[in-house]
Amino acid sequence: MSGKGKVHGGKGKSSETAKSTTSHSARAGLQFPVGRIKRYLKRTAQNKIRVGSKSAIYLTAVLEYLTAEVLELAGNAAKDLKVKRITPRHLQLAIRGDEELDNLIKATIAFGGVLPHINKALLLKVEKKKQK
C-alpha cells in the first residue's frame, strides 16, 4: 500500500451508473414542495408525533388543488373584466362567487372590496315604476 487513497475502478459507483436524485414532489407528480410541507407538519405536530410521508404528499396535493381552483376562478374573473393581471379584487370575486370556497375561506382579503349586492325589495320598486 502506497497510502495514496482509494484506487479508482473498484466496486464504487461511477458517475455514469449513479442514479439522479428525484424529489418527493417529482415522484408524486406535484408542483408544491412535499418536503417542506412534511417539515411544517413535523414542526407543528404536538408531542413529537411521527408524520408519514404519504400524509405529507396528500396534504400537498390538496393544497395544490385548492390553489389551482382559486387561481382558475380568479383568472376567469380577470378575463371577464378584460385585464391580464389577477388582483385581490379578482380573488375576492372568485372566492365569494363559489359557494364551497366561500364556506371554506372565511378570511377577509385585503383590498378585495365587497360584492355588489342590491336588495330584491329595492329592485321590485324600480321595476314597478318602469311598468307604469
From Swiss-Prot:
This is Histone H2A.Z. GO terms for molecular function: chromatin DNA binding; identical protein binding; protein heterodimerization activity; RNA polymerase II cis-regulatory region sequence-specific DNA binding; structural constituent of chromatin. The keyword Transferase does not apply. Acetylated once deposited into chromatin. It is found in: Nucleus; Chromosome. It comes from the Eukaryota. GO terms for biological process: CENP-A eviction from euchromatin; nuclear-transcribed mRNA catabolic process, non-stop decay; regulation of transcription by RNA polymerase II; silent mating-type cassette heterochromatin formation; transcription elongation by RNA polymerase II. Signal peptide: none annotated. The keyword Disulfide bond does not apply. Residues 1-27 are annotated as: Disordered. The modification N6-acetyllysine is found at K4, K11, K13. InterPro entries: Histone-fold (IPR009072), Histone_H2A (IPR002119), Histone_H2A/H2B/H3 (IPR007125), Histone_H2A_C (IPR032454), Histone_H2A_CS (IPR032458). The gene is HTZ1.
